[in-house]
C-alpha cells in the first residue's frame, strides 16, 4: 500500500468518525432539536440574553419546510464542492501538462538522440 493510499484511507476514516461519533455517543440527546443549525442556536442565545430583542433583518426567502431548507443547503454544499473539485482538477491537469511538455522537450533536445553525420 503506497503512502498516498494510506493517507487517503486515514482521512476517510477520520471523516467517517466525525460523522458517526456524534450519533453513536448521543450528543445532543438532551435538546429538543439535537442537531440544530447555527442560526437557531444564535437565536436561542440572543433571546436568553435579551428577551425583547427585535431582529432588524428578515430573510428574502423563507423555505416552506425544514426539508426544503435542508435540500437547498445540500444543493449549495454540492455546488461548492463541485467548484472546488473543478478548480483543483484543472490545476492538477495544468501542472501535469507542463511536466509532460517539459519532459518531451527535454527528451527532444537530448544530445545523444541527434543523428551524427559522417
UniProtKB/Swiss-Prot annotation:
Membrane spanning residue stretches: 7-27, 70-90
Membrane topology, as annotated: Multi-pass membrane protein
Gene Ontology cellular-component terms listed: plasma membrane
Protein name: Cobalt transport protein CbiN
Function as written in the Swiss-Prot or TrEMBL entry: Part of the energy-coupling factor (ECF) transporter complex CbiMNOQ involved in cobalt import.
GO molecular function, one term: cobalt ion transmembrane transporter activity
Subunit-level organization: Forms an energy-coupling factor (ECF) transporter complex composed of an ATP-binding protein (A component, CbiO), a transmembrane protein (T component, CbiQ) and 2 possible substrate-capture proteins (S components, CbiM and CbiN) of unknown stoichimetry.
Family label: Belongs to the CbiN family.
Stored NCBIfam families: cbiN (TIGR01165), PRK02898.1 (NF002780)
Amino acid at each position: 500500500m503506497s503512502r498516498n493510499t494510506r493517507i487517503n484511507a486515514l482521512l476517510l476514516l477520520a471523516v467517517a468518525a466525525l460523522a458517526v461519533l456524534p450519533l453513536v455517543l448521543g450528543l445532543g440527546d438532551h435538546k429538543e432539536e439535537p442537531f440544530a443549525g447555527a442560526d437557531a442556536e444564535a437565536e436561542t442565545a440572543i433571546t436568553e440574553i435579551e428577551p425583547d430583542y427585535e431582529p432588524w433583518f428578515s430573510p428574502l426567502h423563507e423555505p416552506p419546510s425544514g426539508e426544503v431548507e435542508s435540500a437547498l443547503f445540500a444543493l449549495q454544499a454540492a455546488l461548492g464542492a463541485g467548484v472546488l473539485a473543478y478548480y483543483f482538477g484543472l490545476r492538477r491537469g495544468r501542472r501535469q501538462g507542463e511536466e509532460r511538455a517539459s519532459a518531451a522537450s527535454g527528451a527532444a533536445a537530448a544530445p545523444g538522440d541527434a543523428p551524427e553525420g559522417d
